[in-house]
Amino acid sequence: MIEISNLFFNYQNKEVLKIKNLKLDTSKISILMGANGSGKSTFLRILKFLEGDFSKNISYFGNFKPNNKQKREIYLLFPEPILLNRSVRANFLFTLKTYGIKEDIEERIKESLMFLNLDESLLSKHPNELSSGQSQKIAFAIALSVRAKYYLLDEPSAFLDKNTTLLFKKTILKMHENFNTGFLIASHDKHFLDSLAQKKLYLHSGEILEFENTNVFELENQGVKFCNFIDFSNCKKYKDFKKPPSKIAIDPYKISFFNSKNIPKNNYDFILEKCYIIALRSRKSDVFIRVSCMDKILEFALEKQEFLRFDLKLYEELSLYFYEDAICFLN
């Protein structure tokens, strides 16, 4: 587990990251989405000890000051392959030595090459003899040979063709299954990420939301106009802001629903009426239900068993409700 509290990072007088509380389960495959320039790469570099000193803000596996061995449990793979000007085998050996690995060297090399469908004849090649695709695969294979506890992958599919992207996905799943390896994958390639994610994170305005950006809305007059206007100005979280926030995010895992014809009289914090199901998508153990509410689109999540029990259909009308703990205000 990596635990983060009160992490703030500025670059050229601009606030890039402001993460109050976040826990990263290092045994899971987590994905980090966000627009270009949102700070995804910076966040990964911080986690790999390459930016600033955040020893008071980040705990790694229970340690605020991890030793070198513990630091090597984290491996960062950059978007573009970085290979030394020596043979591929020498690149493997250098990395394994750097990570203090002295046993099973040949086994690790062969296994990582096999994962990525790479021929052992490439071990004698130098970087200038490799195609860009081969270089990308070799860099990933070298990373996998370390068998780190937690991998940080920065835009791993950025320069890949469709077949190689699929191969990378299968390899990530194999590593996770065989070695209980965790991954934090930063990308804006939704197709690459969707089938991998056990946990979704979204970086927006320096803050990390534990869901994607479908449910982020602009605030107008301290609220949002769905079918009915929802005023959020009385929320404690809203009042905590010195400057009025400009956006609101609603956690899809904390939204519930009921049939619009049978609205109970319970005291819910917020109710959205006349929501119509427009799309259904299945991911791992959850089903995401996308609804249209006037001109707004939002999603909520159900476990697959729950979804089957309720037998929800496209174009069905629902009312949604949620409490203040489901919302997050953003600048």
Swiss-Prot record:
TM region(s), chain numbering: none
UniProt-listed InterPro entries: AAA+_ATPase, ABC_transporter-like_ATP-bd, ABC_transporter-like_CS, ABC_transpr_CbiO/EcfA_su, P-loop_NTPase, Tungstate_ABC_transporter
Pinpoint the ABC transporter domain residues.
2-230
UniProt keyword annotations, A-Z? ATP-binding, Nucleotide-binding, Translocase, Transport
Reaction catalyzed: tungstate(in) + ATP + H2O = tungstate(out) + ADP + phosphate + H(+)
Q: Where does ATP bind?
A: 34-41
Q: Which GO terms describe its molecular function?
A: ABC-type tungstate transporter activity; ATP binding; ATP hydrolysis activity
Whether Disulfide bond counts among this entry's keywords is no
Please state the Enzyme Commission number of this protein.
7.3.2.6
Primary enzyme class = translocase
Q: List the GO cellular component terms.
A: membrane
The function of this protein is: Part of an ABC transporter complex involved in ultra-high affinity tungstate uptake. Probably responsible for energy coupling to the transport system.
Assembly description? The complex is composed of two ATP-binding proteins (TupC), two transmembrane proteins (TupB) and a solute-binding protein (TupA).
User: Belongs to which family?
Assistant: Belongs to the ABC transporter superfamily.
Q: What is this protein called?
A: Tungstate uptake system ATP-binding protein TupC
The upper taxonomy is: Bacteria, Pseudomonadati, Campylobacterota, Epsilonproteobacteria, Campylobacterales
